[in-house]
Amino acid sequence: MSEVLPAGLATTVLVPASSANLGPGFDSLGIALSLYDEIEVNTTESGLKVAVEGQGAGEVPLDGSHLVVRAIERGLAAGGAAAPGLIVQCHNKIPHSRGLGSSAAAAVAGLGVANGLLAKAGRAVLSDDVLVQLASEFEGHPDNAAASVLGGAVVSWSETSGATPIYAATRLDVHPDIKIVAAIPEEQSSTAHTRVLLPQAVTHVDARFNISRVALLTVALTARPDLLMTATEDRLHQPQRASAMPASADVLAYLRSQGVAAVLSGAGPAVLALTTVDLPDSAVKYAEDQGFSLVAMAVSAGVSVR
């Protein structure tokens, strides 16, 4: 039976955006980015109040179906607790439906809130492994969720031997010379919409190509950033998604033509540039002329709770 937490507990969570795939690492590689949603939560005697400002305001539900609320409840249940009532305030900076992990961030934020409340009540908190598992259950894949939990870059995987998939990840420390720039358009795109564009089968040649590139990318991210251009080549999902987001495909191709290791961020439409030098002025102008906002980011250390 769950213990009902007292009213008057408060916690604040800062959760980072993330980018998945990074070119060849489809549904397995991710990286945490220094763009954050901040969630403030108080326990009350009863009821639920949800407020959202910034990204998603006026678009997301303000009741118990809100993903942050569902994740809070799931995390508390995993910790053997429940809240009598909640005030949830979301200050969102992560753009929605752009390929920057906004839904994974919401799930991780809610679980982080649960950990904060459990800690304030003197109860054991959930481990990082449990956070990755629970957040990935909301997502259906672990790449974004694991990055937001663990920070840095992540290699993630799943095992499906039982009824419930087991999700796991390990962190990679990103080379300090690597700089990240996100090119973010106004248009939105959902993962579900672009995932249906992917073929059910690929050739052995293309599979072998991507295996070599994703292995190389783990080296490029951690020790050899000079290999990023080759390491970010992909044949499994970016070419297939190009028709659904021609502007993103165009910007990605132009950046790569200028020697910039650019990839589609998750399912897009944002484009991520991984580089050790500033972007060429011509690349900046080209992306901005196509309606993209360029945002310089660092690698995040992951979710923080206070």
From Swiss-Prot:
Pathway noted in the entry: Amino-acid biosynthesis; L-threonine biosynthesis; L-threonine from L-aspartate: step 4/5
Predominant location category: cytoplasm
GO biological process per UniProt: threonine biosynthetic process
EC number from the UniProt entry: 2.7.1.39
The protein, known as: Homoserine kinase
Species assigned in the record: Mycobacteroides abscessus (strain ATCC 19977 / DSM 44196 / CCUG 20993 / CIP 104536 / JCM 13569 / NCTC 13031 / TMC 1543 / L948)
Binding residues for ATP: P95, H96, S97, R98, G99, L100, G101, S102, S103, A104, A105
Function: Catalyzes the ATP-dependent phosphorylation of L-homoserine to L-homoserine phosphate.
Pfam family membership, one: GHMP_kinases_N
Keyword Ion transport: no
